[in-house]
Protein backbone atom coordinates (compact mmCIF):
# COMPACT_ATOMS: atom_id res chain seq x y z
CA UNK A 1 0.00 0.00 0.00
CA UNK A 2 1.49 3.36 -1.04
CA UNK A 3 2.14 6.04 1.53
CA UNK A 4 0.01 9.21 1.27
CA UNK A 5 1.54 12.30 2.93
CA UNK A 6 -0.44 14.05 5.65
CA UNK A 7 -0.65 17.84 5.89
CA UNK A 8 -1.32 19.42 9.29
CA UNK A 9 -2.87 22.88 9.43
CA UNK A 10 -3.61 25.08 12.45
CA UNK A 11 -7.27 25.98 13.04
CA UNK A 12 -9.15 27.97 15.68
CA UNK A 13 -9.80 24.66 17.45
CA UNK A 14 -6.27 23.34 17.27
CA UNK A 15 -4.74 21.35 14.43
CA UNK A 16 -6.40 19.50 11.58
CA UNK A 17 -4.81 16.76 9.49
CA UNK A 18 -5.56 16.21 5.79
CA UNK A 19 -4.17 13.67 3.38
CA UNK A 20 -2.40 15.59 0.62
CA UNK A 21 -5.12 14.94 -1.99
CA UNK A 22 -7.90 16.20 0.28
CA UNK A 23 -5.89 19.33 0.99
CA UNK A 24 -5.39 19.97 -2.72
CA UNK A 25 -9.10 19.36 -3.30
CA UNK A 26 -9.72 22.41 -1.10
CA UNK A 27 -7.81 24.36 -3.77
CA UNK A 28 -10.03 22.77 -6.47
CA UNK A 29 -7.22 20.53 -7.71
CA UNK A 30 -8.03 16.94 -8.74
CA UNK A 31 -5.38 14.31 -9.48
CA UNK A 32 -5.83 11.63 -12.14
CA UNK A 33 -2.61 9.84 -11.28
CA UNK A 34 -3.04 6.13 -11.95
CA UNK A 35 -4.62 3.62 -14.31
CA UNK A 36 -8.15 4.65 -15.26
CA UNK A 37 -10.53 2.04 -13.82
CA UNK A 38 -14.02 1.98 -12.30
CA UNK A 39 -13.17 2.66 -8.65
CA UNK A 40 -10.78 5.48 -9.50
CA UNK A 41 -13.28 6.97 -11.98
CA UNK A 42 -16.02 6.99 -9.34
CA UNK A 43 -13.74 8.95 -7.00
CA UNK A 44 -12.88 11.50 -9.71
CA UNK A 45 -16.55 11.91 -10.68
CA UNK A 46 -17.49 12.41 -7.02
CA UNK A 47 -14.82 15.10 -6.64
CA UNK A 48 -16.00 16.92 -9.77
CA UNK A 49 -19.61 16.90 -8.56
CA UNK A 50 -18.57 18.04 -5.08
CA UNK A 51 -16.59 21.00 -6.44
CA UNK A 52 -19.49 21.97 -8.70
CA UNK A 53 -21.88 21.93 -5.72
CA UNK A 54 -19.41 23.98 -3.68
CA UNK A 55 -19.02 26.69 -6.34
CA UNK A 56 -20.45 26.22 -9.85
CA UNK A 57 -18.71 29.35 -11.18
CA UNK A 58 -15.14 28.61 -10.07
CA UNK A 59 -12.68 26.72 -12.28
CA UNK A 60 -11.46 23.20 -11.50
CA UNK A 61 -7.88 22.06 -12.19
CA UNK A 62 -7.27 18.45 -13.21
CA UNK A 63 -3.68 17.19 -13.11
CA UNK A 64 -3.17 14.09 -15.25
CA UNK A 65 -0.38 11.50 -14.98
CA UNK A 66 -1.99 8.34 -16.31
CA UNK A 67 -1.13 5.46 -18.66
CA UNK A 68 -4.81 5.15 -19.60
CA UNK A 69 -7.08 2.25 -18.80
CA UNK A 70 -10.70 1.17 -19.15
CA UNK A 71 -12.62 3.10 -21.81
CA UNK A 72 -15.99 3.10 -20.01
CA UNK A 73 -14.38 4.38 -16.80
CA UNK A 74 -12.60 7.12 -18.73
CA UNK A 75 -15.80 8.13 -20.49
CA UNK A 76 -17.55 8.45 -17.11
CA UNK A 77 -14.95 11.05 -16.11
CA UNK A 78 -15.04 12.73 -19.53
CA UNK A 79 -18.84 13.00 -19.58
CA UNK A 80 -18.86 14.49 -16.08
CA UNK A 81 -16.26 17.08 -17.13
CA UNK A 82 -18.58 18.16 -19.95
CA UNK A 83 -21.71 17.96 -17.78
CA UNK A 84 -20.75 20.16 -14.84
CA UNK A 85 -20.92 23.96 -14.90
CA UNK A 86 -17.34 24.88 -13.82
CA UNK A 87 -14.64 25.04 -16.48
CA UNK A 88 -12.16 22.19 -16.11
CA UNK A 89 -8.54 23.07 -16.87
CA UNK A 90 -6.31 20.06 -17.60
CA UNK A 91 -2.55 19.72 -17.15
CA UNK A 92 -0.39 16.76 -18.19
CA UNK A 93 2.39 15.97 -15.73
CA UNK A 94 4.44 12.94 -16.76
CA UNK A 95 2.13 11.19 -19.19
CA UNK A 96 -1.38 11.25 -20.58
CA UNK A 97 -1.77 8.08 -22.63
CA UNK A 98 -4.79 6.36 -24.14
CA UNK A 99 -7.85 7.44 -22.10
CA UNK A 100 -5.60 9.86 -20.22
CA UNK A 101 -5.08 11.80 -23.45
CA UNK A 102 -8.84 12.04 -24.04
CA UNK A 103 -9.30 13.54 -20.57
CA UNK A 104 -6.45 15.95 -21.30
CA UNK A 105 -7.91 17.23 -24.57
CA UNK A 106 -11.44 17.17 -23.10
CA UNK A 107 -10.60 20.09 -20.83
CA UNK A 108 -11.87 23.62 -21.44
CA UNK A 109 -10.60 25.00 -24.75
CA UNK A 110 -7.69 27.35 -24.09
CA UNK A 111 -7.09 25.75 -20.66
CA UNK A 112 -5.41 22.49 -21.70
CA UNK A 113 -1.75 22.42 -20.71
CA UNK A 114 1.29 20.17 -20.64
CA UNK A 115 4.54 20.43 -18.73
CA UNK A 116 7.58 20.51 -21.05
CA UNK A 117 8.83 16.93 -20.56
CA UNK A 118 5.52 15.09 -20.52
CA UNK A 119 4.44 12.63 -23.17
CA UNK A 120 1.02 12.16 -24.72
CA UNK A 121 -0.18 9.07 -26.58
CA UNK A 122 -3.30 8.29 -28.58
CA UNK A 123 -4.36 4.96 -30.07
CA UNK A 124 -7.40 2.90 -30.96
CA UNK A 125 -9.10 0.82 -28.24
CA UNK A 126 -8.07 -2.80 -27.74
CA UNK A 127 -9.62 -5.81 -26.09
CA UNK A 128 -9.63 -9.59 -25.95
CA UNK A 129 -12.65 -11.84 -25.67
CA UNK A 130 -13.39 -15.54 -25.33
CA UNK A 131 -16.52 -17.63 -25.42
CA UNK A 132 -19.03 -18.57 -28.08
CA UNK A 133 -18.40 -17.27 -31.60
CA UNK A 134 -21.59 -15.19 -31.51
CA UNK A 135 -20.56 -13.52 -28.25
CA UNK A 136 -17.09 -12.75 -29.64
CA UNK A 137 -18.73 -11.15 -32.69
CA UNK A 138 -20.97 -9.02 -30.43
CA UNK A 139 -17.97 -7.78 -28.44
CA UNK A 140 -16.01 -7.08 -31.62
CA UNK A 141 -18.87 -4.95 -32.97
CA UNK A 142 -19.04 -3.07 -29.66
CA UNK A 143 -15.29 -2.39 -29.80
CA UNK A 144 -15.70 -0.95 -33.30
CA UNK A 145 -18.51 1.31 -32.03
CA UNK A 146 -16.26 2.56 -29.22
CA UNK A 147 -13.46 3.13 -31.74
CA UNK A 148 -15.76 5.32 -33.87
CA UNK A 149 -16.95 7.22 -30.79
CA UNK A 150 -13.41 7.95 -29.60
CA UNK A 151 -12.39 9.08 -33.08
CA UNK A 152 -15.32 11.51 -33.11
CA UNK A 153 -14.45 12.89 -29.66
CA UNK A 154 -10.80 13.46 -30.57
CA UNK A 155 -11.92 15.09 -33.83
CA UNK A 156 -14.22 17.42 -31.89
CA UNK A 157 -11.63 18.54 -29.35
CA UNK A 158 -8.64 18.79 -31.71
CA UNK A 159 -10.64 20.26 -34.61
CA UNK A 160 -8.95 17.75 -36.91
CA UNK A 161 -10.67 15.98 -39.79
CA UNK A 162 -12.12 12.61 -38.78
CA UNK A 163 -10.08 10.79 -41.44
CA UNK A 164 -6.87 12.29 -40.06
CA UNK A 165 -7.81 11.18 -36.53
CA UNK A 166 -8.59 7.65 -37.73
CA UNK A 167 -5.19 7.40 -39.45
CA UNK A 168 -3.34 8.91 -36.47
CA UNK A 169 -4.91 6.45 -34.01
CA UNK A 170 -4.31 3.22 -35.95
CA UNK A 171 -1.24 2.43 -33.82
CA UNK A 172 0.30 3.79 -30.60
CA UNK A 173 1.05 7.42 -31.47
CA UNK A 174 3.39 9.09 -28.97
CA UNK A 175 3.79 12.86 -29.02
CA UNK A 176 5.96 15.43 -27.33
CA UNK A 177 4.14 18.45 -25.83
CA UNK A 178 5.05 20.46 -28.94
CA UNK A 179 3.60 17.76 -31.21
CA UNK A 180 0.50 17.46 -29.02
CA UNK A 181 -0.02 21.22 -29.25
CA UNK A 182 0.29 21.13 -33.04
CA UNK A 183 -2.15 18.19 -33.13
CA UNK A 184 -4.67 20.10 -30.99
CA UNK A 185 -4.57 17.96 -27.85
CA UNK A 186 -3.23 20.82 -25.70
CA UNK A 187 -3.28 24.60 -26.03
CA UNK A 188 -0.08 25.60 -24.24
CA UNK A 189 3.12 24.18 -22.79
CA UNK A 190 3.84 25.40 -19.26
CA UNK A 191 7.30 25.58 -17.70
CA UNK A 192 6.23 27.53 -14.61
CA UNK A 193 3.14 28.42 -12.62
CA UNK A 194 3.77 32.10 -13.45
CA UNK A 195 3.31 31.34 -17.16
CA UNK A 196 -0.06 29.70 -16.48
CA UNK A 197 -1.18 32.65 -14.34
CA UNK A 198 -0.18 35.04 -17.12
CA UNK A 199 -2.25 33.12 -19.69
CA UNK A 200 -5.25 33.04 -17.34
CA UNK A 201 -5.41 36.85 -17.24
UniProtKB/Swiss-Prot annotation:
<dbReference type="GO" id="GO:0009368">
    <property type="term" value="C:endopeptidase Clp complex"/>
</dbReference>
<dbReference type="InterPro" id="IPR018215">
    <property type="entry name" value="ClpP_Ser_AS"/>
</dbReference>
<dbReference type="GO" id="GO:0004252">
    <property type="term" value="F:serine-type endopeptidase activity"/>
</dbReference>
<protein>
    <recommendedName>
        <fullName>ATP-dependent Clp protease proteolytic subunit</fullName>
        <ecNumber>3.4.21.92</ecNumber>
    </recommendedName>
</protein>
<keyword id="KW-0720">Serine protease</keyword>
<keyword id="KW-0378">Hydrolase</keyword>
<dbReference type="InterPro" id="IPR033135">
    <property type="entry name" value="ClpP_His_AS"/>
</dbReference>
<dbReference type="InterPro" id="IPR023562">
    <property type="entry name" value="ClpP/TepA"/>
</dbReference>
<comment type="subunit">
    <text>Fourteen ClpP subunits assemble into 2 heptameric rings which stack back to back to give a disk-like structure with a central cavity, resembling the structure of eukaryotic proteasomes.</text>
</comment>
<keyword id="KW-0963">Cytoplasm</keyword>
<dbReference type="GO" id="GO:0004176">
    <property type="term" value="F:ATP-dependent peptidase activity"/>
</dbReference>
<comment type="similarity">
    <text>Belongs to the peptidase S14 family.</text>
</comment>
<dbReference type="InterPro" id="IPR029045">
    <property type="entry name" value="ClpP/crotonase-like_dom_sf"/>
</dbReference>
<feature type="active site">
    <location>
        <position position="123"/>
    </location>
</feature>
<dbReference type="InterPro" id="IPR001907">
    <property type="entry name" value="ClpP"/>
</dbReference>
<dbReference type="GO" id="GO:0051117">
    <property type="term" value="F:ATPase binding"/>
</dbReference>
<dbReference type="Pfam" id="PF00574">
    <property type="entry name" value="CLP_protease"/>
</dbReference>
<dbReference type="GO" id="GO:0006515">
    <property type="term" value="P:protein quality control for misfolded or incompletely synthesized proteins"/>
</dbReference>
<feature type="active site" description="Nucleophile">
    <location>
        <position position="98"/>
    </location>
</feature>
<keyword id="KW-0645">Protease</keyword>
<dbReference type="GO" id="GO:0005737">
    <property type="term" value="C:cytoplasm"/>
</dbReference>
<comment type="function">
    <text>Cleaves peptides in various proteins in a process that requires ATP hydrolysis. Has a chymotrypsin-like activity. Plays a major role in the degradation of misfolded proteins.</text>
</comment>
Amino acid sequence: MSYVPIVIEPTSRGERAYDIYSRLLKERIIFVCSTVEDHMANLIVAQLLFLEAENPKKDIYMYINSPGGVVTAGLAIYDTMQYIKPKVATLCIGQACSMGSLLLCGGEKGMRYSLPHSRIMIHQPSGGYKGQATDIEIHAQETLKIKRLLNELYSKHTEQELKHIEKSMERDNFMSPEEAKKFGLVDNIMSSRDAMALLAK
